[in-house]
């Protein structure tokens, strides 16, 4: 980042008021009567009602539209383990996106815990304060155990966006890309470079969407994850296959799909040349992908390419998913975000990309036209229809799969965030 851009980022966060979020009042407070209702003695009445039935917290407090964004700061963006407090700007930023795109209030919680179990214990004890929990920037493999334990212990949705948000958007784009390439997920040969939280979640969700595990090769820093390796943790071991392939060059031969969640420049011209016709390449490392889009297209003009960057077509951006997934989950008071809800989000995103693009989106991107094809396989983050389509699909899937505590909302579909409260 240039000095000018660095200073602009610092100024944005510091001026005119430090931080990006604030608390606003939702009730009148102008008179003595207002204050008596807001606090003592009036506040005693909702206290009694919640003590009588904890579900009344959704009626008398902001719990139902409140998500906690929680981190230990062990894997902050691409910066690494910088500690809980340093993660606060990122957690506030996540809150901005929740509010901007789905009308969800949030609070950021940075936990200084000496172990994964200490983190789990801390969060579990206070989880009932919120309608949902978004885990963020927690390193692998600890993030898997933390999420699993909290899902089991909490009766509200717990969602590690670094895993599942990336997976949902990737799967949606992948289904569309393969369709354009004249291929199917069920028969596609997939190579995944990377075996961290996002990579493992992506491959698990692709399998849930129809990919065959025997057609999937995953690589970590030591090469292909195969059944002969004895250094695999339980999460990598799920993807160990019986093969004589050992390197990316071996694995990529004839592959239909490459998913990169690893590091910059790790895919070469020779690698992409070895892929099958109409190769699908998702090079998602930011800011520099596994292979630069210009180089990929120069080497393989038939490539269908996606990256994590906003300055190239087909950006894999988690903001396409998490605000609307939580919106749908909160509005039916789901106890968890399960596989059915994730798959529903995948198909909602996939289908939306096939519809005509609104004029407002074209103007925002200074385009005369955008339509479903090689350069448009995923919707754009500013498409207002995301709120309607993804939230509705997730809410319906929660109801259908039995994790909703309320019926499908009568005020759905949502057209804008102003419709959130019906």
From Swiss-Prot:
Record CDD domains: NAD_bind_2_malic_enz
InterPro entries: Aminoacid_DH-like_N_sf, Malate_Decarboxylase, Malic_enzyme_CS, Malic_N_dom, Malic_N_dom_sf, Malic_NAD-bd, Malic_NAD-bd_bact_type, Malic_OxRdtase
Annotated PROSITE patterns: MALIC_ENZYMES
UniProt-annotated site: Important for activity, residues: 162
Reactions the enzyme catalyzes: (S)-malate + NADP(+) = pyruvate + CO2 + NADPH; oxaloacetate + H(+) = pyruvate + CO2
Annotated binding of substrate, by residue: 94, 318
GO molecular function: malate dehydrogenase (decarboxylating) (NADP+) activity; metal ion binding; NAD binding; oxaloacetate decarboxylase activity
Enzyme class: oxidoreductase
Active site per UniProt: 39 (proton donor), 94 (proton acceptor)
Cofactor(s) for this UniProt protein: Mg(2+); Mn(2+)
Induction, as annotated: Up-regulated by salt.
SMART domains: malic, Malic_M
E.C. number: 1.1.1.40
Cofactor: how and how many bound: Divalent metal cations. Prefers magnesium or manganese.
The keyword NADP belongs to this UniProt entry's keyword annotation: yes
Oxidoreductase is among the record's keywords: yes
PANTHER family the record matches: NADP-DEPENDENT MALIC ENZYME
Family, per entry: Belongs to the malic enzymes family.
Protein name: NADP-dependent malic enzyme
């Amino acid at each position: 980042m240039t000095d000018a851009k660095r200073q602009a980022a610092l100024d944005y966060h510091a001026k005119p008021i430090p931080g990006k979020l604030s608390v606003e009042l939702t009730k009148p407070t102008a008179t003595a009567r207002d204050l008596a209702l807001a606090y003592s003695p009036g506040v005693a009445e909702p206290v009694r009602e919640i003590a009588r039935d904890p579900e009344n917290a959704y009626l008398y407090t902001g719990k139902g539209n409140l998500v906690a964004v929680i981190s230990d700061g062990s894997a902050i963006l691409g910066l690494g383990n910088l500690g809980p407090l340093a993660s606060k700007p990122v957690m506030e930023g996540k809150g901005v996106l929740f509010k901007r795109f789905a009308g969800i209030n949030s609070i950021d919680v940075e936990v200084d815990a000496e172990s994964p179990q200490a983190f789990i214990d801390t969060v579990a004890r206070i989880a009932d304060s919120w309608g949902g929990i978004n885990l963020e920037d927690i390193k692998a493999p600890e993030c898997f155990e933390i999420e699993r334990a909290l899902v089991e212990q909490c009766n509200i949705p717990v969602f590690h966006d670094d895993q599942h948000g990336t997976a949902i958007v990737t799967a949606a784009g992948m289904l569309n890309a393969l369709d354009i390439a004249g291929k199917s997920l069920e028969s596609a040969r997939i190579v995944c470079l990377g075996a961290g939280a996002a990579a493992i979640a992506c491959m698990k969700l692709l399998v849930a969407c129809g990919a065959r595990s025997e057609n999937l090769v995953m690589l970590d820093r030591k090469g292909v994850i195969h059944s002969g390796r004895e250094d695999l943790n339980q999460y990598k071991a799920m993807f160990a296959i019986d093969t004589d392939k050992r390197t990316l060059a071996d694995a990529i031969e004839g592959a239909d799909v490459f998913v990169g969640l690893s590091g910059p420049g790790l895919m070469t011209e020779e690698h992409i040349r070895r892929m099958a016709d109409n190769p699908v390449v998702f090079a998602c490392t930011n800011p520099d992908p596994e292979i630069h889009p210009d180089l990929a297209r120069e080497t393989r003009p038939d490539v269908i390419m996606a990256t994590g960057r906003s300055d190239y077509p087909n950006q894999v951006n988690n903001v396409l998913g998490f605000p609307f997934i939580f919106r749908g989950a909160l509005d039916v008071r789901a106890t968890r975000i399960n596989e059915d809800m994730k798959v529903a989000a995948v198909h909602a995103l996939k289908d939306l990309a096939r519809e005509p693009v609104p004029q407002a989106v074209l103007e925002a991107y200074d385009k005369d036209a955008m339509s479903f094809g090689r350069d448009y396989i995923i919707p754009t983050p500013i498409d207002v229809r995301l709120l309607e389509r993804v939230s509705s699909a997730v809410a319906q899937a929660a109801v259908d799969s039995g994790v909703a505590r309320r019926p499908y909302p009568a005020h759905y579909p949502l057209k804008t965030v102003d419709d959130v409260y019906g």
